[in-house]
Amino acid sequence: MLPTFKRYMSSSAHQIPKHFKSLIYSTHEVEDCTKVLSVKNYTPKQDLSQSIVLKTLAFPINPSDINQLQGVYPSRPEKTYDYSTDEPAAIAGNEGVFEVVSLPSGSSKGDLKLGDRVIPLQANQGTWSNYRVFSSSSDLIKVNDLDLFSAATVSVNGCTGFQLVSDYIDWNSNGNEWIIQNAGTSSVSKIVTQVAKAKGIKTLSVIRDRDNFDEVAKVLEDKYGATKVISESQNNDKTFAKEVLSKILGENARVRLALNSVGGKSSASIARKLENNALMLTYGGMSKQPVTLPTSLHIFKGLTSKGYWVTEKNKKNPQSKIDTISDFIKMYNYGHIISPRDEIETLTWNTNTTTDEQLLELVKKGITGKGKKKMVVLEW
Amino acid sequence: MLPTFKRYMSSSAHQIPKHFKSLIYSTHEVEDCTKVLSVKNYTPKQDLSQSIVLKTLAFPINPSDINQLQGVYPSRPEKTYDYSTDEPAAIAGNEGVFEVVSLPSGSSKGDLKLGDRVIPLQANQGTWSNYRVFSSSSDLIKVNDLDLFSAATVSVNGCTGFQLVSDYIDWNSNGNEWIIQNAGTSSVSKIVTQVAKAKGIKTLSVIRDRDNFDEVAKVLEDKYGATKVISESQNNDKTFAKEVLSKILGENARVRLALNSVGGKSSASIARKLENNALMLTYGGMSKQPVTLPTSLHIFKGLTSKGYWVTEKNKKNPQSKIDTISDFIKMYNYGHIISPRDEIETLTWNTNTTTDEQLLELVKKGITGKGKKKMVVLEW
């Protein structure tokens, strides 16, 4: 059983909250960005009776959130005096899932109802908070159908994986058409394989060499719908490319799209496996190495290399995010996309008992902790 | 005075030739590709009275011609028995300028006249020859207005430089709009600067560091129309990029296009200087290093990286080559593009006195020789 939203619903729903608490920052620090965070209790300046008030259910701690604290992320919120600070400050966090606990009487509430679960339409709204206040329903997307973990991560990983598959290639689902991607164990890559499978597109996922390769590959293939998983050493092996790859791909295979979130040699090797005049999209650079492309791929094979940035794409075209979430939810309801909960380690913020000091420590642990993706889940 | 075509016109024009002589190859050899070349005398199989017969005036020895002999070039002519060889063979060379010496009576001659100077529309026709035979005027482009050196090189370097500037960006010639390119001393780069200048686009040309930097930069700026020349060390210098570059570019500058024929660090450094959502076209890889692109340029700056290949582009769309040559000739006639003769070392093939052995040595020298671009000029 997935945790239902009910479990997180407060008995005090439908009331205007009084105690606002947010994780805020005024400055940036590259080395140890947890230093710039503090917990701030404040009274919002808005007239809450005329606002959409949201109770936070969960927020993930994403790499981009951390990069924002470090001051190295190109997209950032405006810092304001809204939280009664001495210096202009912003609330950390860019995505999360919320429950509507109070609505205005006018048209600005749109079709929202009390108890609806929503996510912010845009990044930079600040999500590391117990409550948030919005003025218009058009800045929110309803996600009642999604479980907690899917809803809290759909804006970044969900949209990224979905749009990478859906928005660039005019696929023929009757053909033998493939995506090749590196970092095949990442959260986004798992969305990619599931969305691709649902659309009749095959995926070749490259993962790092490891002792339990077969076991990991089996999970990616059986649970997440990867068509075939290969290792980075196979990816980089010219003999493999010549002799084995064509058997994996089958007859009349077209490898039309490469998805790169690693860079360096891995990016060159997935690009080499593309058909002529194909596309590589880069959306991450885990290896810290630049994207590396043999000149001949550009000149003689017509390769196009572009970037994908979920924040900018959906800022430019908010409707595309609304449409993506709608399609994502349909696929989720059909069982084509499973919850990412197994990939996530939850950190519990009990809004009744967790002290400010404990909350700060909790979030710092989420920022610095290794292993699974971290998500703060609020208990009410 | 540029050498005129008159000088190369034969007294025997308007006659059907009897002695065909071509540099041909049947096999390939990477290490020393001159080994596969031989001089072949033959009688063409076509009915020459029903053909367009061309006398060769000059042909350059291009890197792509050499790569074809090596067997490492993705575009290659079909090998045939047309030249009375034991093994199927092809004539070397992909561009050159010819004079029409015999025409058929029918419509296949189009608007060609005896004495017209022409170039082949497509690559892979074989140009290292004293005569060539074509069946239709639609396979030829008239270039009567160009001097020998411009005409013999317009298919590769001329088209490349012209199309790189003209075919990808919708320029605003009233704006402060820039192209940045590396290998600023190359033949193509010199076409780029001249075409750009004629179109009201500014060029920032990067050249390798050298003792006589100022002298070389001055020639590129004064003679070839580069707006500003900088060194690779300046290109790679972050302080230069921050403090000096904006002064060079001026107010409201837009660096909209990067042209890369070097690769490696140089490609990363020119790409960094582009505005957001800009384009880098790679058309060569002199450093033998792959195209290297910081991940952030793709993701956060919206960089698109593509390739340019003159052969494929004009094969796909022959009309675009015809249009390019037409525009090139107009610009040449206005004096916006000068002859590349100063960049070229000529090797003379006297069709009356040069023996086959001497001819082969001449061409081998052209293939292996360092320094200036080599062109074989035929004397009749």
Curated annotation (Swiss-Prot), chains A, B:
Coiled coil: none annotated. It is found in: Mitochondrion matrix. It catalyses: a 2,3-saturated acyl-[ACP] + NADP(+) = a (2E)-enoyl-[ACP] + NADPH + H(+); (2E,4E)-hexadienoyl-CoA + NADPH + H(+) = (4E)-hexenoyl-CoA + NADP(+); (2E)-hexenoyl-CoA + NADPH + H(+) = hexanoyl-CoA + NADP(+). It comes from the Eukaryota. The modification Phosphoserine is found at S339. It is an enzyme of class 1 (oxidoreductase). Induction: Positively regulated by the zinc-responsive transcriptional regulator ZAP1. The keyword Lipid metabolism applies. Keywords: DNA-binding, Fatty acid biosynthesis, Fatty acid metabolism, Lipid biosynthesis, Lipid metabolism, Mitochondrion, NADP, Oxidoreductase, Phosphoprotein, Transit peptide. This is Enoyl-[acyl-carrier-protein] reductase, mitochondrial. The lineage of its organism: Eukaryota, Fungi, Dikarya, Ascomycota, Saccharomycotina. The gene is ETR1.
